Amino acid sequence: MSNHTHHLKFKTLKRAWKASKYFIVGLSCLYKFNLKSLVQTALTTLAMITLTSLVITAIIYISVGNAKAKPTSKPTIQQTQQPQNHTSPFFTEHNYKSTHTSIQSTTLSQLPNTDTTRGTTYGHSIDETQNRKIKSQSTLPATRKPPINPSGSNPPENHQDHNNSQTLPYVPCSTCEGNLACLSLCQIGPERAPSRAPTITPKKTPKPKITKKPTTTTIHHRTSLKAKLQPKNNTAAPQQGILSSPEHHTNQSTTQI
């Protein structure tokens, strides 16, 4: 764009110079014809035109010089660089090794742990695989939490009591024979928990007993033919027939025959 504008300005200057030439030729012709008043006016106008053209050219050259002095590319914004901690690789490796040594020392110091709820001492065996895991981790290990009692019978203990109980060793009471210090430690130490969990036997629900109702036996007595043939008004005769014995029935049958 800047080259195009300069080219247009150069063309306009050429045209102005040509017009001034034609104007000068015209003035010379008028001077030959003894027209002094017209010549004076024309010379004054020519002087004004030349002065204006000189001013315009001076402005153009100054603007072109400033454009060449300035870079055409866009101004680059300098980013504010944040202060970085330029540490040497030896220093970082030294810090890395020191952190691993501190981690290993803390793990070795936490080997003899005592469980307050069960009172058993145990030691963590460190293998090569554990050492590799410790080296790979850069953060410190989390503090060991006490195991949760599944039965929930024991109340929750304070954190200070837990730390104090870890520092004191467990001494069995069987080894103390008349030693007061040993007996005091034996009393303070936690009780030994059973090796096996108690087996819970499920209770059998008793089945409800079904009581049978007693069966009533009905005795059917034979009625005689007379009792059947008697009219309904006579109520005493059928009762006698019902209450009569089987021998009486046989006698009646023989008499009828």
UniProtKB/Swiss-Prot annotation:
Organism of origin: Bovine respiratory syncytial virus (strain Snook) (BRS)
Transmembrane segments: 38-66
Disulfide bridge positions per record: 173-186, 176-182
UniProt keywords, alphabetically: Disulfide bond, Glycoprotein, Host cell membrane, Host membrane, Host-virus interaction, Membrane, Secreted, Transmembrane, Transmembrane helix, Viral attachment to host cell, Viral immunoevasion, Virion, Virus entry into host cell
Family: Belongs to the pneumoviruses glycoprotein G family.
Residues modified by glycosylation: 72, 80, 85, 87, 92, 105, 139, 163, 199, 215, 233, 251, 253
Descriptive protein name: Major surface glycoprotein G
GO cellular component entries: extracellular region; host cell plasma membrane; membrane; virion membrane
